A protein has these predicted regions:
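Post-signal peptide N-terminal segment of mature Sec-exported envelope proteins
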Residues: 24-70
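Short coil/linker segments at helix-helix boundaries
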Residues: 23, 40, 68-93, 113-130, ...
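Bacterial signal peptide processing site
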Residues: 19-21
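C-terminal motif of bacterial Sec signal peptides marking the signal peptidase cleavage site
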Residues: 14-17
């Protein structure tokens, strides 16, 4: 009986080892298909790899990424929505095993951001931001999550700005209020109350991104945009003009850096 038990254990280990080898083979096939743009085939390979070895984190990450790659932001088809939701689910499964997996944290933050725009979902934007903040908590030296917090804060504050102007125009027919005009005093007060803290957060985080990566031209572009939202909080023309001047300066800096990057040969 003892020998039989030992033999059965050996068989079990052998079967487990074979399954893990098969999982890695399926993973490699999936990676090759993914690199060739054959995403449907890649998904099936990654699924098989995951089934054969549920502990193979790379299979889960690649499966989630393959779903996310096929997701088209704003496309309303049920299949497209299913792709986005499947990506979220797979990234969440990775985080259940390792809550500090940066790749999964970034992946879910990215797909939620893409899913939040159309149809608009404030909840998804906020959830996306929470994942980028998790990245910051784990690796505060990385500039990218600060950038994404700034992008989300601008996206939300810009939408709120347009809505505030639209509501005022409807209530005051015949009175012009252009998108770059100062906000009326009552609208400005409400806008600051609802968005002021978020705008300040975005500006702070984008400046942090630039502190960590001084040539981060995309961060400069969004800092310019958020400073324009900050200008809508200004109570005096001089304060508004100063903020708009700062915004314009970042536009010029971003242009200079982009031009410099274009003129610099890529490293081999």
């Amino acid at each position: 009986m003892a020998l039989f038990a030992v033999a059965m254990i050996a068989v079990g280990f052998g079967a487990s080892g074979c399954a893990k080898l098969k999982a890695r083979d399926e993973l490699n096939k999936g990676v090759a298909a993914y690199r060739d743009g054959k995403y449907d085939a890649a998904i099936e390979f990654f699924k098989d790899a995951k089934d054969n070895d549920p502990t193979l984190t790379n299979a889960q990450l690649y499966l989630a990424t393959a779903y996310a790659t096929q997701y088209i932001p704003g496309a309303p088809s049920p299949e497209n929505i299913r792709m986005g939701e499947a990506a979220v689910k797979q990234f969440q499964e990775v985080l259940q095993g390792d809550p500090n997996d940066i790749s999964a944290i970034d992946g879910i933050g990215s797909i939620l951001f893409n899913m939040a725009g159309t149809p608009y979902s404030r909840e998804k934007f906020d959830e996306s931001k929470s994942y980028h903040m998790k990245h910051i908590a784990l690796k505060p030296e990385d500039p990218e999550p600060y950038y994404w917090v700034g992008v989300i804060d601008w996206t939300l504050s810009y939408r709120a700005n347009l809505e505030a102007r639209g509501t005022w125009r409807l209530a005051h027919p015949g009175k012009p209020l252009k998108d770059d005009d100062p906000l009326p005093a009552d609208v400005r007060e409400t806008y600051i109350k609802d968005n002021g803290t978020m705008i300040d957060e975005g500006i702070t985080d984008l400046r942090k991104a630039l502190e960590l990566r001084p040539d981060y031209d995309d961060a400069m572009a969004y800092l310019n945009l958020l400073l324009r939202r900050k200008a809508d909080e200004a109570a005096t023309p001089d304060e508004r003009a100063s903020l708009l001047k700062q915004a314009d300066d970042y536009v010029e800096k971003a242009k200079e850096i982009k031009q410099k990057k274009m003129e610099t040969p890529a490293k081999p």
